[in-house]
């Protein structure tokens, strides 16, 4: 009798397990799993740094860099990662308008591939030599999908696979640009980077 009860219980468990894994309806059609989506929001502060090695025209180049900052010169940013169970993650960056501190310009960050660190980036302190990616910056409201800028980007993470206390570096080597702008000047190097420093966030919002 005990043997029969054990076999009956085992049979019930097998049936329940099969039903739990079965994604078909009464007609035998396979029902795809419900797609799941979520987003995580991380707040950063932004600071622009640059190094100009051009003895005769350094001040003019520095003034030009200050007059044309990346992402509109914002000091506050929101980095958003949108995840979908059936799609690749979508990375977005919102630059808070410095004039009203409320509205924001949104950009999609498209990874264009891995790149090597450029020698001129060594002029910065804390410049990594590994884990660089080229990113195209595309405005959210664009109609043609064309990037407005391209940066060499790397992220420094104190905690692996976590944005807590992380820093993001958006770097650009502008040496050739300013050599063309000032062809008669001796310009050795012009590099600039936007440094995003972690403030708060990391919460996951299910959509």
Each language-model region and where it sits:
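Edge beta-strand at a domain terminus
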Residues: 165-207
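Bacterial Sec-dependent N-terminal signal peptides
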Residues: 18-52, 196-207
